């Protein structure tokens, strides 16, 4: 989930330093609001510090625990197999638009019991802030959030929005703004990041089919492969913190933002041997793609289970493919071999 902030005055880099900063919420606070050009509310529980952060996290955790998500695997698998079959019926298609995005949205439809919304979510494209034009705008998302909030308050449907609308935090039912903040993260947090993960997997296997063959011969490597793809692709490369909590004062210096570089931790040579190589035999893999500390991603189990189903379906399909077109924006030095954004990726069956 990409969040827009003004430029950071400094950036914390390196695995050890990043982990220490993410633990130190008093010095590096999440009490800030990103995307101020398109929203006027906090994304929750992302943009609030402990102890209130913990209250939101405890209330939301039951929706994301691993046993609950594992019950949905058969539906994830059915969607994955159908989309793969349909995708490879064509000579060459764009992966993000025709495979990764639809699959991620269908999975979210299952998780949230909102299959009726999947086509609308897909229509937003990879970034909801640019759903209607290249200019960032919040109207599309906010129309949807306002509509589902009004619907949820009627308790007419048994879905996740009806439950979220009546959550209590510290003994009080959440407000409309809090609902926006929670639901917005739930729609965005597992959207562009997982789309990038799936697209990156297809890109890698298209360029290195021997790695797909390795997994077919050694399915016990699927778990390590998931963690290695998460590390290498680093779907969310950085986030900001603030050294001046924004709700505590009206005097907010322009240089209050500090960048936290997850990608620097994931390619730290003191932790990962040959970090610029994808290695499914890598043992310990303490990557930072889900963050670290109190704000560790709530949806990490969802992403891992989705990726496991995706890889298992690819392995069982017997398919192989090659990249026919790639328009990729890579990161700046020293990460110039690491995709930042897949503008277009077309593949063809071999």
Placement of each model-derived feature along the sequence:
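Cytochrome P450
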Residues: 1-350
């Amino acid at each position: 989930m990409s969040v827009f902030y003004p430029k950071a005055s400094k950036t914390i880099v390196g695995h050890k330093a990043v982990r220490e900063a993410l633990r130190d919420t008093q010095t590096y606070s999440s009490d800030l609001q990103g995307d101020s050009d398109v929203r006027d509310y906090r994304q929750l529980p992302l943009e609030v510090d402990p102890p209130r952060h913990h209250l939101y996290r405890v209330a939301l955790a039951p929706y994301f625990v691993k046993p609950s998500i594992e019950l949905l695997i058969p539906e994830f698998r059915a969607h994955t197999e159908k989309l793969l079959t349909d995708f490879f019926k064509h000579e060459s298609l764009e992966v993000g638009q025709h495979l990764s995005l639809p699959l991620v949205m269908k999975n979210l439809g299952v998780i949230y019991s909102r299959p009726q919304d999947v086509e609308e979510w897909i229509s937003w494209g990879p970034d909801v802030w640019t759903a209607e034009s290249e200019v960032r705008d919040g109207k599309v998302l906010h129309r949807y959030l306002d509509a589902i909030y009004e619907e949820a308050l009627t308790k007419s449907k048994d879905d996740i929005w009806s439950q979220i609308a009546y959550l209590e935090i510290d003994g009080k039912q959440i407000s409309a703004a809090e609902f926006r903040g929670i639901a917005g993260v739930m729609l965005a947090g597992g959207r562009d990041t997982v789309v990038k993960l799936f697209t990156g997997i297809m890109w890698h296997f298209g360029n290195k089919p021997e790695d797909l063959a390795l997994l077919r011969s050694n399915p016990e490597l699927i778990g390590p492969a998931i963690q290695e793809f998460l590390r290498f692709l680093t779907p969310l490369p950085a986030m900001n913190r603030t050294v001046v909590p924004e709700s505590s004062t009206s005097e907010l210096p322009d240089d209050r933002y500090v960048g936290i570089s997850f990608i620097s931790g994931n390619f730290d040579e003191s932790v990962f041997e040959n970090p610029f190589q994808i290695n499914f035999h890598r043992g310990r893999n303490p990557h930072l793609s889900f963050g670290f500390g109190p704000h560790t991603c709530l949806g990490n189990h969802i992403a891992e289970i989705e990726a496991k189903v995706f890889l298992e379906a690819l392995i069982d399909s017997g398919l192989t493919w090659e990249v026919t077109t790639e328009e990729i924006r890579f990161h700046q030095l020293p990460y110039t071999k690491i995709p930042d954004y897949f503008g277009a990726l077309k593949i063809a069956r071999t």
